[in-house]
């Protein structure tokens, strides 16, 4: 097998691997580097054409062979990419004969081996992950649509807390739609070269994906901020705070995404805008996300501290099993609502831990919207009570007063009022 066929086999497998974690698969770096090496090699060959006797500078599909005199042997190492598959660096030799360059020795498959079956298995693995996250986002979108419809249709559930839940639900739906749009743009054909693919639809899908991701993180943060203010506030009025959260939750992601799009158009308008690992402009998107996850985690710990204090008996410390259960239940409910699981990978490089990161962030993460809809709508006692009242036609006048008004307990020792019911 000559170098051209060997390079074509590798390109065919690598360029068809799916996009992972919102970025082109790392092997695309190898293909991009090869294309840059080819361009440099051919430009140098054009400048040196007919400048000397012997063998001219030549690109064979993987390596650039320099000019050489008759009878001269040239040795070059395998491209750096092949070191991932072999502990010993390979090398090739070519002889400059009177009739031109000889064939590389040893042949490329022997000098620079690549387990093609491994790449095939990797492609199959990514396809499976894609099926899982497509299913997850689809299920989540349907559940979230139903949850929003319930919160909007039942007027007794109209309150700032549920308004914020609805905004968060909407961001999960937007995120699912962005994933479907991106997949449609990138994977509409099996023959598409994902490493160099570049269309307006592709760039729009990537920008939409970034905006959806940022809005999702911003409303996860809004949930944490709102609950913190609710637990610590001395005033039951929260509607003004809600509108500030709306402005920040949608406005800031739009501002950062618009800035990123402007920078890409002006300074880095290449490929499909998803080669971001080495781009300084990527931090316009990633920086606010990392910051929001860090702040969210801090607020999560603070809320657990507040809950621990409020569950503490007057005489002593928390020690009874029911109180431990209440605290554990509250903590577990906050994890999907605040997206605390993102702390695990959010501070690592995008290419780190792909083997674990893909199933967790793409697989389980796609079901996060479904879990949030279940916990904060379908299993919510107020929602179930209101649906039951509507279903059985109960007279609203017979409902207890706490169903329609906010009730505030007396100040605790810490002088913070405890909200027992919001709606």
UniProtKB/Swiss-Prot annotation:
Top-level taxonomic group: Eukaryota
Membrane side Extracellular: residue ranges: 23-130, 189-210, 262-283, 353-357
Natural source organism: Sus scrofa (Pig)
Membrane topology term: Multi-pass membrane protein
Annotated GO MF terms: G protein-coupled peptide receptor activity; growth factor binding; growth hormone-releasing hormone receptor activity; peptide hormone binding
Residue ranges annotated as Cytoplasmic topological domain: 152-167, 232-240, 305-331, 379-423
Coiled coil region boundaries: none
Lineage: Eukaryota, Metazoa, Chordata, Craniata, Vertebrata
Keywords noted in UniProt: Cell membrane, Disulfide bond, G-protein coupled receptor, Glycoprotein, Membrane, Receptor, Signal, Transducer, Transmembrane, Transmembrane helix
Protein family membership: Belongs to the G-protein coupled receptor 2 family.
CC terms in the record's Gene Ontology section: plasma membrane
Designated name of the protein: Growth hormone-releasing hormone receptor
């Amino acid at each position: 097998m000559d170098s051209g066929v060997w390079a074509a086999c590798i390109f065919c497998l690598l360029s068809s691997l799916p996009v992972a974690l919102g970025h082109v698969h790392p092997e695309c770096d190898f293909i991009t580097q090869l294309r840059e090496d080819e361009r440099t090699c051919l430009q140098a060959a054009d400048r040196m054409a007919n400048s000397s006797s012997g063998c001219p500078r030549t690109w064979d599909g993987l390596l650039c062979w320099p000019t050489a005199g008759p009878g001269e042997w040239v040795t070059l190492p395998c491209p750096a990419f092949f070191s991932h598959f072999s502990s010993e660096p390979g090398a090739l030799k070519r002889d400059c004969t009177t009739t031109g360059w000889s064939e590389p020795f040893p042949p490329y498959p022997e000098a620079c081996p690549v387990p093609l079956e491994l790449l095939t298995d990797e492609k199959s693995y990514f396809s499976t992950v894609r099926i899982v996250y497509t299913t997850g986002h689809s299920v989540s979108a349907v559940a979230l649509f139903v949850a929003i419809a319930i919160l909007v249709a039942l007027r007794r559930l109209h309150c700032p807390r549920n308004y914020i839940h609805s905004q968060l639900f909407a961001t999960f739906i937007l995120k699912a739609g962005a994933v479907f749009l991106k997949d449609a743009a990138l994977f509409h054909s099996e023959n598409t070269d994902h490493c160099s693919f570049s269309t307006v639809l592709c760039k729009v899908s990537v920008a939409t994906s970034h905006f959806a991701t940022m809005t999702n993180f911003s409303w996860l943060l809004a949930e944490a901020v709102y609950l913190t203010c609710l637990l610590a506030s001395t005033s039951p009025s929260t509607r003004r705070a809600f509108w500030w959260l709306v402005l920040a939750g949608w406005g800031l992601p739009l501002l950062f995404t618009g800035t990123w799009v402007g920078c890409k158009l002006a300074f880095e308008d290449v490929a499909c805008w998803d080669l971001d690992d080495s781009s300084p402009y990527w931090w316009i998107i990633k920086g606010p996300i990392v910051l929001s996850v860090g702040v969210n985690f801090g607020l999560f710990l603070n809320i657990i501290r507040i809950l621990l204090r409020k569950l503490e008996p007057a005489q002593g410390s928390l020690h009874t099993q029911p109180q431990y259960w209440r605290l554990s239940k509250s903590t577990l409910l906050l994890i999907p609502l605040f997206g605390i699981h993102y702390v695990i990978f959010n501070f690592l490089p995008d290419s780190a831990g792909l083997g674990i990161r893909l199933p967790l962030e793409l697989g389980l993460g796609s079901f996060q919207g479904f879990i949030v809809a279940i916990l904060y709508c379908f299993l919510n006692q107020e929602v179930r009570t209101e649906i039951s009242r509507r279903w059985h036609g109960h007279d609203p006048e017979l409902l207890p007063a706490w169903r329609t008004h906010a009730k505030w307990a007396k100040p605790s020792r810490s002088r913070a009022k405890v909200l027992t019911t919001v709606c």
